């Protein structure tokens, strides 16, 4: 990889940070140790500002270039939280906390951004301001939204925002991204079906919620195939089916379904919600039952803007072995989406080699990907804000 030589020198130090984070995983907003170490290191690097407590437990660092005459302000983001998973890697530096694991590589993301921060603080070879966003609670807590709601973009005048995520299956040295939806929105629904309980021997005197809910499940799975344009990506999954009966000779009075819908655009996101409600309510009504639908919006689409993708790709081509600027979108979700709703920006995938997929107990972050991640952040800042 044509990465910057300085990161080859810094790799042992950055790797040690990463391994320390890996040994001490923290969940959601409870990232006090991690955030404290980030704050300590940013201060030691000589950042112009280091502000904790943004978005509850997020940390912001500010690095000014040799000049700030350009007025440009670019934000770089890394997530800090781990997952409630019991680690099965067998690593010497495996999690010391049973039931908690950095199974998505956020320890690597945090270490990469710290490495970039150290370099940028040393060199300051740019005309403008870099804002470092160390974010809690990506794994379901919407920490990105919390930082945006806390005014991080306005307080520091951020104009563009960039982030990365390691990607198992992509070779180390490879960077991939795309214009538009890179990762899906993720919404959840719950459908409570109420009928009329009764004896299994007298179904004519009951309204069988098991039957009604089963028909709803079948009909829900026709939404994607029969109402969504086939060139668009939408995933609908019913994940749980429960009734209030545990006996074989009882017709349940109530049944409950829970599921998720993932889309890559706002139009289909709205369409999916409308159709789920209509299918559930109308199907239940046809059987003489009722259906109450509770829709819980989750993360939006991670929607990269065209100009910023072009900048991200240009920087990537300067430091990576290979770059895919038109990678296919994938259907997991990511709360960097909230930052992209607030400002133009781009999110990239950083090759993590041949390992178990994210969220698997055997997942491993590849430390050899660190220099490229650091180099990309630095290259991006220096190209977007060239020194005079």
Segments (PLM) and residue ranges:
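Acidic/His- and Gly-rich active-site-bordering loop/insert found
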Residues: 1-102, 107, 111-114, 118-126
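Divalent metal-coordination and catalytic microenvironments
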Residues: 21, 61, 76, 106, ...
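Active-site beta-loop-alpha junctions enriched in small/polar residues
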Residues: 26, 79-81, 137, 167, ...
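Conserved acidic residues
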Residues: 48, 158-159, 344
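Histidine/acidic-residue-rich, glycine-tolerant segments that coordinate divalent metal ions
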Residues: 59, 82-85, 89-101, 107-108, ...
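Non-cysteine beta-strand/loop elements that form the S-adenosyl-L-methionine
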Residues: 75-77, 86, 189, 347-352
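Metal-dependent amide/peptide-bond hydrolase catalytic core
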Residues: 211-388
């Amino acid at each position: 990889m044509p990465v910057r030589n300085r990161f080859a020198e810094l790799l042992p130090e950055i790797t040690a940070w990463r391994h320390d984070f890996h040994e001490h995983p923290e969940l959601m907003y409870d990232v006090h140790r991690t955030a404290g170490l980030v704050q300590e290191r940013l201060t030691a690097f000589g950042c112009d500002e280091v502000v904790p407590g943004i978005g509850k437990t997020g940390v912001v660092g500010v690095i000014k270039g040799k000049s700030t005459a350009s007025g440009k302000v670019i934000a770089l983001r890394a997530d800090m939280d781990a997952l409630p998973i019991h680690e099965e890697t067998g690593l010497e530096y495996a999690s010391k906390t049973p039931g908690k694991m950095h199974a998505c590589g956020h320890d690597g993301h945090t270490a990469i951004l710290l490495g970039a921060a150290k370099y940028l603080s040393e060199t300051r070879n740019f005309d403008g301001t870099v804002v470092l966003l160390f974010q809690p609670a990506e794994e379901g807590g919407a920490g990105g939204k919390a930082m945006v709601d806390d005014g991080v973009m306005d307080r520091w005048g951020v104009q563009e925002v960039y982030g990365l995520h390691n990607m198992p299956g992509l070779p180390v040295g490879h960077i991939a991204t795309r214009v538009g939806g890179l990762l899906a929105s993720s919404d959840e629904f719950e459908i409570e079906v109420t009928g009329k309980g009764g004896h299994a021997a007298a179904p004519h005197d009951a309204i069988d919620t098991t039957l009604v809910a089963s028909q709803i499940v079948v009909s829900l799975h026709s939404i994607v195939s029969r109402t969504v344009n086939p060139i668009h990506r939408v995933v609908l999954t019913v994940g749980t089916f429960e009734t209030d009966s545990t006996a074989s000779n009882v017709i349940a009075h109530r049944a409950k379904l829970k599921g998720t819908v993932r889309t890559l655009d706002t139009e289909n996101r709205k369409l999916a919600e409308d159709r789920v409600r209509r299918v559930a309510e109308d199907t239940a009504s046809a059987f003489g039952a009722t259906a109450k639908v509770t829709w819980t919006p989750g993360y939006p689409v991670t929607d990269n803007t065209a100009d910023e993708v072009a900048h991200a790709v240009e920087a990537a081509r300067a430091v990576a072995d290979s770059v895919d600027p038109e990678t296919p979108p994938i259907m997991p979700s990511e709360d960097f989406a909230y930052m992209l709703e607030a400002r133009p920006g781009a999110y990239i995938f950083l090759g993590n080699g041949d390992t178990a997929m994210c969220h698997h107990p055997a997942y491993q972050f590849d430390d050899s990907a660190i220099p490229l991640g650091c180099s990309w952040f630095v290259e991006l800042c220096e190209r977007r804000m060239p020194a005079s």
